[in-house]
From Swiss-Prot:
Polar residues composition bias: residue spans: 108-122
Lineage of the species this protein comes from: Eukaryota, Fungi, Dikarya, Ascomycota, Saccharomycotina
Protein name in UniProt: Maintenance of mitochondrial morphology protein 1-2
Record-linked InterPro entries: Mmm1, MMM1_dom, SMP_LBD
Residue stretches spanning the membrane: 24-44
Species assigned in the record: Yarrowia lipolytica (strain CLIB 122 / E 150) (Yeast)
Recorded domain comment: The SMP-LTD domain is a barrel-like domain that can bind various types of glycerophospholipids in its interior and mediate their transfer between two adjacent bilayers.
Function: Component of the ERMES/MDM complex, which serves as a molecular tether to connect the endoplasmic reticulum (ER) and mitochondria. Components of this complex are involved in the control of mitochondrial shape and protein biogenesis, and function in nonvesicular lipid trafficking between the ER and mitochondria. The MDM12-MMM1 subcomplex functions in the major beta-barrel assembly pathway that is responsible for biogenesis of all outer membrane beta-barrel proteins, and acts in a late step after the SAM complex.
Annotated keywords: Endoplasmic reticulum, Lipid transport, Lipid-binding, Membrane, Transmembrane, Transmembrane helix, Transport
């Protein structure tokens, strides 16, 4: 029996009540509904607040008090605050406050602003110079006997710290702010410089000073170029005048015959800033400076210490005559004298030392001025463990000349070493008085009148 195809298609249409179009529309609607549910209940879901119905009132009161504190108002205890900062989502800080010791402080290192948190155990925090807070019950006798510490009594009600929200909102009505006090720490100018420049004297590593070596080399190159501009005539004339200004009678005129400024440069390294204390002018640290006896010095100053190494050939050659057995009585009438020609050449071969450079103030008490005179001093000296290697060459006589006499060489070497120690080796120092950039006030009327009278007397005497 054969069933017609029309009957089969009609039966299939009666069994399937949905067509392709109806299925497509139903699928799209289901996808849209699913997306809407996800967006509403998952992504844009409102946070459920664990607080009770009266929390909104407490939060509004807390915000009003925060605005009052931020504008520079006063809290219930009469303590002026500078600002409050909160963060509602800081769970880690809440846990840290819950597990921390009572009365602990939150402070920022390297700043003069200190944060105070009131203690819940009734302890009175004590502020030291480093900004840390210590409960009075745990400070001990050392804190009680210190006169530089600052004790701030605070109530025992718990408050909030920076970014920490308390669990109980009922305490926000009175005490709910952290107090930021601007403490003017009594720091010396040297300590303040170190604090603001973040330089730790104990932990800072020495510096190489490569850039400074290049700068010094350029300066030395310019000095050598200026000296050789006129065949060293200007330099030779200056040295001749310096040598012949003060010389004994048995030495004839000194003539500079050779000068060599070298072709190498000093190398500075291992520079470090130290904190060096100095005493009054009469102590050993200030001896040999040709300073006034009534000068005083600061208790402490910064000092730059660095190693210097110079390997070069800096040569100075002179010639003169030694006048021997010259009779003083017959010298106006007869020129009976015996002279011995001497030629010397001194060369600096190697110099290594530890260089100290410091900048401090000298306070000089004057009778004319009511105020003391302050001068800025730049001092330079070397430590005693220096090494100065010299090469001395000599030539004595006119006809039968003696070359490189050991006795004369050792004598010249010892004299130069002694002169260097007496002028530039610690405790002696080479000082430079730096000029003031700002004009100083005129002296008192008495001093001005005395100066005018002195000038008038001088003018009358010259006329």
């Amino acid at each position: 029996m054969v069933i017609p195809a029309e009957l089969i298609q009609k039966a299939l249409k009666q069994q399937s009540g949905w067509g392709f179009t109806e299925g497509l529309v139903l699928g799209q609607l289901s996808v849209i509904i699913t997306v809407i549910i996800i967006l509403k209940f998952v992504i844009f879901a409102e946070n459920k607040s664990p607080k009770k119905g009266n929390d909104m009132t407490a939060v509004s009161a807390k915000d009003k008090e925060a605005e009052h504190v931020a504008m520079g108002g006063q809290t219930a205890n009469g303590v002026k605050t500078s600002g409050v900062r909160r963060n509602k989502s800081s769970t880690n800080l809440r846990n840290r406050l819950a597990t921390g010791a009572a009365g602990a402080s939150i402070s920022r290192p390297g700043s003069s602003r200190v944060s105070m948190v009131r203690s819940t155990s009734g302890a009175v925090p004590v502020l030291g110079q480093n900004g840390g807070a210590t409960p009075r019950g745990m400070a001990g006798s050392s804190v009680a006997g210190s006169t530089s510490n600052l004790a701030v009594p605070v109530p025992t009600t718990p408050t909030i710290a920076e970014g920490i929200e308390p669990e109980n909102d009922s305490t926000l009505q009175d005490d709910s702010a952290i107090i930021d006090l601007d403490l003017d720490l009594d720091l010396s100018p040297v300590d303040e410089i170190l604090h603001k420049t973040c330089y730790q004297l104990s932990s800072h590593a020495p510096e190489s000073l490569d850039w400074f070596n290049v700068l010094v080399a350029q300066i030395i190159t310019q000095l050598r170029f200026d000296a050789k501009a006129n065949n060293n005539l200007n330099l030779l004339n200056s040295l001749d005048a310096a040598f012949n200004s003060k010389r004994p009678d048995f030495i004839d005129r000194i003539n500079v015959t050779e000068i060599n400024l070298g072709d190498d440069y000093p190398i500075l390294s291992n520079c470090k800033i130290t904190h060096k204390g100095t005493g009054p002018a009469g102590s050993g640290a200030a001896s040999g400076n040709n300073m006034p006896n009534n000068a005083e010095y600061d208790d402490s100053r910064l000092e730059a210490q660095m190693d210097i190494d110079l390997s070069d050939t800096i040569t100075l050659g002179i010639e003169t005559r030694l006048n021997l057995n010259q009779p003083k009585i017959l010298s106006p009438f007869l020129s009976l004298s015996t002279s011995l020609p001497v030629s010397l050449s001194v060369t600096i071969v190697r110099f290594t030392a530890r260089l100290n450079i410091s900048l401090y103030q000298q306070i000089e008490q004057t009778e004319e001025d009511e105020k003391d005179k302050r001068d800025t001093i730049l001092s330079i000296n070397f430590e005693p463990d220096y090494k100065l290697q010299l090469s001395v060459k000599s030539l004595v006589g006119s006809r039968s000349r003696l070359q490189n006499v050991p006795t004369l060489e050792s004598l010249v070497d010892s004299k130069i070493q002694k002169w260097f120690r007496d002028h530039y080796v610690e405790p002696h120092q080479m000082i430079f008085i730096l000029p003031s950039l700002w004009p100083r006030k005129k002296r008192s009327a008495t001093a001005g009148a005395a100066g005018t009278a002195t000038g008038a007397d001088t003018a009358s005497g010259s006329s």
